[in-house]
């Protein structure tokens, strides 16, 4: 007996898992994990499946994290939110804004659950989760012990954290603590946001602009399956960036604090005339080259082949090698996504 994973991944790829368990509290997560472990099965915890690509049938148990609840504590200088890992991220952004607690608006419409946000250190339009994260509560799967990691202990990086490294497969995230400062400062460094006046802009205007940019450029997973940005924006050494800018002076680039330079993967892909290119049922989105879509009953092999093609074309033209942001899941767990498309 197997269960289809199609409803549980936004790519809409039709693979199966041996078991699927829905967990509404910590105990249910632990019970499902212990049961799978006793049976010698692999086990993974999934939010809304908006950042994964299942490469094949999963041989174990998929636990759907559905822990809910939002608590707010106000202090003199900030609002402190304690949010269940299974809450929808965008609904949280709206909730905060509706209750006059700004600070999350640049992160509007990022798909997925709150519990997934620290794993990737989600980010968009100049803001990353680490800017507002206070702590992450998790439970050790083997012992059932509760842990609270401060933001510093989460070791956030660009689309990276301790949860993708030492703590991968060892803990389940049960809640995230956010600190939204009452001294709100808009971040208007990207896209249409640069046109807004920092002196008069409201959080609602930032939210509206972000939603407009995302809905006009990004495909709706309900129409064309996708996992949002498929590739990370590459971060390269300054000398490589200089070399590239000598050849392509109009290439978007964002100097980083450590001297490296972040490039725009979407622009690099676009320069290779790859928008609309298809392999099997998978396609490069026509509006946003960074997004690969399930255009016509794509298989995971189609998506991997297309990602490989994109990576090769960009690498040959720019000598910059893209890495997937999407996590690749094999038969018994996560596999190296770069190796899968190299």
From Swiss-Prot:
Cofactors that this protein relies on: FAD
Q: In which pathway does it act?
A: Cell wall biogenesis; peptidoglycan biosynthesis
Report the residue ranges that make up the FAD-binding PCMH-type domain in this protein: 13-183
Q: Give the UniProt record's GO annotations in the biological process aspect.
A: cell division; cell wall organization; peptidoglycan biosynthetic process; regulation of cell shape
Q: Which reaction does it catalyse?
A: UDP-N-acetyl-alpha-D-muramate + NADP(+) = UDP-N-acetyl-3-O-(1-carboxyvinyl)-alpha-D-glucosamine + NADPH + H(+)
The cross-references to Gene3D superfamilies, in alphabetical order and at most eight, read: 3.30.465.10, UDP-N-acetylenolpyruvoylglucosamine reductase, C-terminal domain, Uridine Diphospho-n-acetylenolpyruvylglucosamine Reductase, domain 2
Q: What is its EC number?
A: 1.3.1.98
- Which InterPro entries does the entry mention? FAD-bd_PCMH, FAD-bd_PCMH-like_sf, FAD-bd_PCMH_sub1, FAD-bd_PCMH_sub2, MurB, MurB_C, MurB_C_sf, Oxid_FAD_bind_N
Task: Give the top-rank taxon of the lineage listed in the UniProt record for this protein.
Answer: Bacteria
Catalytic residues at 159, 229, 325
Recite the UniProt keywords alphabetically. Answer: Cell cycle, Cell division, Cell shape, Cell wall biogenesis/degradation, Cytoplasm, FAD, Flavoprotein, NADP, Oxidoreductase, Peptidoglycan synthesis
> Where does the record place it?
Cytoplasm
- Can you list the GO cellular component terms from the UniProt entry? cytosol
Q: What does this protein do?
A: Cell wall formation.
NCBIfam families in the record: murB, PRK00046.1
Family in the record? Belongs to the MurB family.
Q: What name appears for this protein in its UniProt entry?
A: UDP-N-acetylenolpyruvoylglucosamine reductase
Q: Which organism is it from?
A: Salmonella choleraesuis (strain SC-B67)
Lineage here is: Bacteria, Pseudomonadati, Pseudomonadota, Gammaproteobacteria, Enterobacterales
Gene designation per UniProt: murB
